[in-house]
């Protein structure tokens, strides 16, 4: 699919309030310029368009049209509608929160200033969708905010509202996947309290209480109560500097079990999953999950859900690599509205580039069922024949 054809689909009248000729041309120019320049800097975007007018005139046109609050909502709705058409009941809705920093910035609207004015940043919540065994994804929503934006209540509220917006567009189809590393416990608690949201969440707060019949237990206590019946060997690719001076392929024995519990805040019955990992050089580690997924009594169902969660890291890594190739921190707009629209248009370009790349993993899988290829430090011994093959 060409970028022009993707733009036509994004701007189709059926997706949202119809765009006028000026807005349609602007969207087409921005997608082409962002893709061609690999940048969110308006000067570089304008230069990539190579229009038969002065660079200053192109820049001025883009900047003027970028200041449009209605267009922010319109394009965001279009991108969400376009993606939500592909979301089914088992689609992973992966939630990731990051920060967009501008060092020594002073004049950007609603930009909170960090201590000593050295660094300041906006929060960005991205929700991307991926099928359970897929090696690709598609963006659904990018939401930008800061503590200074009028009406701000809390980061947790911003994340929760983003999740609800996506689920409204998908008619509550899809399962929210959260690795609590970037999403706060407060945001997770809001999701747990909602009886309609389906989720698979790694829970950092082990003191969180759940009900088993008439008794309450912390997740820490539940880890000891649940038998981890099903297990298998996985190989984890560990980055340089964690276990040594080179990449390491770590052999892991992964075993899991689950038990039915109730969430006190909602009274909703869910499954608690205990995931334990152990290697030849590391002690056993237990991780608690809560999920609304049912029918997890078989090995295939439970370990399949665990695999789906573990592979989420590969999808996020691929997304971060692609997103960062556009150097989003190099934006040079002063208004919050322009930044919102820039980030939404970037998500659209990412959606296009992912769609044309096909179902191919652009980065190494962190977790694999067999040893990773290459010259790696390994925590296990390879058979001689395998050693020859993997070193090629």
Residues covered by each model-derived region:
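Single, function-defining residue in the core of a domain
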Residues: 1-31, 39, 78, 120, ...
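Short, positively charged, Gly/Tyr-enriched micro-motifs
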Residues: 12-72, 176
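Active-site-proximal, Lys/Arg-enriched surface segment
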Residues: 31, 59-134
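Short, well-ordered amphipathic alpha-helices
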Residues: 45, 126-128, 160
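Residues in flexible loops and secondary-structure boundaries
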Residues: 48, 70, 103, 297-298
């Amino acid at each position: 699919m060409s970028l022009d054809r993707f733009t036509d689909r994004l701007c189709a009248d059926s997706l949202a309030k119809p765009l006028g000729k000026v807005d349609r041309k602007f969207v087409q120019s921005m997608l082409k310029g962002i893709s061609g320049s690999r940048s969110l800097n308006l000067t570089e975007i304008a230069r990539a368009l190579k229009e038969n007018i002065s660079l200053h005139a192109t820049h001025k046109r883009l900047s003027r049209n970028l200041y449009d609050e209605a267009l922010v909502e319109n394009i965001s709705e279009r991108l969400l509608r376009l993606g939500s058409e592909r979301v089914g009941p088992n689609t992973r809705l992966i939630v990731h929160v990051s920060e967009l920093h501008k060092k020594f910035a002073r004049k950007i609207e609603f930009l909170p200033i960090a201590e000593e004015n050295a660094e300041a940043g906006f929060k960005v919540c991205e929700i991307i969708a991926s099928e359970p065994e897929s090696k690709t994804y598609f963006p659904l929503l990018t939401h930008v905010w800061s503590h200074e934006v009028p009406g701000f209540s809390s980061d947790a509220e911003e994340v929760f509202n983003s999740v609800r917006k996506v689920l409204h567009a998908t008619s509550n189809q899809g399962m929210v996947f959260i690795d609590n590393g970037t999403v706060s416990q407060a945001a997770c608690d809001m999701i747990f309290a909602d009886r309609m949201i389906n989720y698979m969440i790694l829970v950092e707060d082990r003191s969180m209480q759940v009900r088993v019949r008439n008794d309450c237990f912390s997740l820490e206590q539940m880890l000891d109560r649940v038998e981890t019946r099903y297990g298998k060997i996985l190989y984890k690719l560990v980055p340089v500097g964690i276990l040594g001076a080179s990449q390491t392929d770590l052999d892991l024995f992964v075993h899991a079990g689950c038990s039915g519990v109730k969430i006190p805040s909602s009274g909703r019955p869910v499954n608690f999953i205990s995931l334990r990992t152990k290697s030849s050089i590391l002690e056993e580690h237990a991780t608690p999950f809560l999920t609304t997924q049912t029918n997890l009594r078989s090995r295939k169902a439970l370990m399949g859900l665990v695999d789906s969660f573990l592979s989420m890291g590969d999808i996020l890594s691929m997304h971060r690599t692609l997103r960062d190739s556009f150097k989003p921190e190099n934006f040079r707009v002063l208004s919050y509205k322009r930044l919102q629209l820039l980030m939404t248009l970037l998500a659209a370009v990412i959606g296009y580039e992912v769609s044309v790349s096909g179902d191919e993993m652009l980065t190494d899988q962190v977790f694999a069922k067999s040893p990773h290829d290459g010259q790696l430090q390994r925590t296990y011994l390879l058979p001689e024949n395998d050693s020859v093959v993997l070193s090629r």
